């Protein structure tokens, strides 16, 4: 079942987005729009000065970069959950899988909001592989 115009779908439910009113959490709305490739909704929810900081080779992506990646299948999330959210920040965790064959990662994301929109996302990630060992493990 698809969602009507001006709605986003997450976990089999449609959530209507009204101008300047969040009907679901900001993080959930952005994640749902990203997964579905809803560029119009992302355009509304992401601040023009947005930065995505991944710490991979000093890479920083902007709003247009994130919107162009949305819905492409380049990154898919599993077990996504929101750990904390208020009007200023949101913290989320999930398992990221990459279409290019890179090792999947457990990703913790810190999000900051400004003027009601997402302005910053910064991630920390742990590779998930069969041979990965914590320090001190034999």
Roles of regions detected by a PLM:
Residues 2-3, 28, 39:
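Residue-level detector of transmembrane insertion/anchoring sites
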Residues 1-22:
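N-terminal amphipathic/basic-hydrophobic helices that include classical n-h-c signal peptides
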Residues 36-51:
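Short, well-ordered alpha-helical segments enriched in acidic and aromatic residues
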């Amino acid at each position: 079942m698809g969602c009507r115009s001006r709605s986003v779908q997450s976990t089999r439910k449609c959530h209507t987005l009204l101008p300047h009113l969040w009907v679901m959490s900001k993080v959930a709305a952005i994640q749902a729009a990203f997964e579905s490739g809803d560029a119009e909704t992302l355009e509304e929810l992401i601040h023009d000065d947005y930065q995505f900081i991944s710490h991979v080779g000093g890479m920083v992506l902007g709003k247009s970069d994130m919107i162009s990646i949305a819905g492409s299948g380049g990154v898919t999330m599993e077990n996504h959950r929101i750990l904390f959210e208020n009007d200023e920040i949101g913290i989320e965790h999930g398992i990221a899988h990459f279409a290019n064959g890179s090792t999947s990662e457990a990703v913790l994301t810190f999000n900051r909001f400004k003027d009601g929109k997402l302005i910053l996302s910064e991630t920390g990630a742990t590779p998930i592989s069969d041979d990965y060992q914590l320090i001190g493990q034999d």
